[in-house]
Amino acid sequence: WDAKNNRLMETSETKTSKKNWKEVIPHRDDVHLLDMEIFKDHLVINERKDGLRGLRIIHQKTGKDEYLDFGESTYTSRISTNREFNTNVVRYSYSSMLTPSSTYDYNMDSGQLTLMKQQEVVGGYDQNNYESERLYAIARDGEKVPISIVYKKDLKKVESQNLLLYAVSYTHLTLPTIAIV
């Protein structure tokens, strides 16, 4: 309702008419609210900003929020299935152009991160041999178009290197991931 990129509203179970709605997360032109998971003491939001799917954790008692820092410039993340309401641990999936599809448990109180599973990349892949960057090209209409690149660390970068464009920007396209073939 009145929010192209979505917004989050709350109401009581007994008074559900629109006049009783209270805004929890407002509409933002530059952020698309994609998904959420409710826990006893936390609200976890999956949102897209600048083409990247990130995770935002709101501590319900204090109202403070934090964005998980994945330590890479290009990535995608999704809230996984979390069946337990009374927990402070959220499970999510993560991948990037360097990191294979991974499942993590994150303790929303202590900040402890535990890798639960990671897809194997066969053939001797070592992500430490590669770099990943996020650049922007300016389109004819003046909009910034994100470009995610990955290259071997020993590559000599020069101003006029060629670029293979894998995908054109679509509204809901998130591609920064390793393709396992």
Predicted regions and their residues:
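Beta-propeller blade signature
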Residues: 9-12
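Non-catalytic accessory segments flanking enzyme active sites
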Residues: 23, 34-35, 46, 53-58, ...
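Conserved small/polar residues in nucleotide/adenosyl-binding loops
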Residues: 171-177
